Amino acid sequence: MADKKAPASGWPIVSGEYVVGNPESCVAVVTLGSHGLDEAAIEAGAAISGPCHTENLGIEKVVANYISNPNIRFMLVTGSEVQGHITGQCFKALYENGIGDDGGIIGAKGAIPFLENAGQDAISRFQNQLVEIVDLIDVEDTGKISSAIKDCISKDPGAFEEDPMILDLEGGGGEAGADESTSIKPAAPETVLLEARMRMISEKINDAALIAKFNSGYYNGKIQGIAIGLFLSLLIFSLL
């Protein structure tokens, strides 16, 4: 049997709308923008399961709960991707690349992928503690999710060798999922999409203006060519 450790007192240390299972399980599940998958994940053996909507504070809260429980060695990212925030891809980028000096998640494609409270030490712990992030983004089939959880459990390497690490988040609260009405105010998905569409419309207007300018020049050049041709024809006939 794999060796286990006690998680931090009161784990999960950050409150939220997640469901908690066996704290000695090696698997934690994030269901991104989907709901209704958590009970199935817990029944399959996950330690914790819940949604995560934002690529900044939401990710920090997930990290805080994971690194405070050394038994968690696998992260299963599933459920529908969050439009605009692209949280699932941001989790993968965080695990693979970490953060820069400015707190930005390297390679993340979300709207505001910056971690203000989780520093290099916490992210390094997150990367080292996890053996693997299992990518089931946009999968909502509870059968596939349960099967993936059980597969991870069969490969349980035991608890991470270091003690629980406590990440202090300003304003408290929790999301793995959680209430996000704290100091960081991420952009709503609708706002991000609206801005993207406005940029696209602006680009199309610019393209249309260029086409109109080209057509206008072409038309004017064509008229000038006809006029010159008529003038030369008259000149030739007058010389005959």
UniProtKB/Swiss-Prot annotation:
Co-factor remark: Binds 1 5-hydroxybenzimidazolylcobamide group.
Classification via InterPro entries: MeTrfase_MtrA/MtxA, MtrA
Extracellular-side positions: 235-240
An individual GO BP term: methylation
Membrane-crossing residue ranges in chain numbering: 217-234
Pathway(s) served: One-carbon metabolism; methanogenesis from CO(2); methyl-coenzyme M from 5,10-methylene-5,6,7,8-tetrahydromethanopterin: step 2/2
Residues reported in the UniProt entry to bind 5-hydroxybenzimidazolylcob(I)amide: 85
Catalytic activity: 5-methyl-5,6,7,8-tetrahydromethanopterin + coenzyme M + 2 Na(+)(in) = 5,6,7,8-tetrahydromethanopterin + methyl-coenzyme M + 2 Na(+)(out)
Cofactor field: 5-hydroxybenzimidazolylcob(I)amide
HAMAP family in the cross-refs: MtrA
Role of this protein: Part of a complex that catalyzes the formation of methyl-coenzyme M and tetrahydromethanopterin from coenzyme M and methyl-tetrahydromethanopterin. This is an energy-conserving, sodium-ion translocating step.
Subunit structure: The complex is composed of 8 subunits; MtrA, MtrB, MtrC, MtrD, MtrE, MtrF, MtrG and MtrH.
Record family assignment: Belongs to the MtrA family.
Name of the protein in question: Tetrahydromethanopterin S-methyltransferase subunit A
Gene source species: Methanococcus aeolicus (strain ATCC BAA-1280 / DSM 17508 / OCM 812 / Nankai-3)
Gene name linked to the record: mtrA
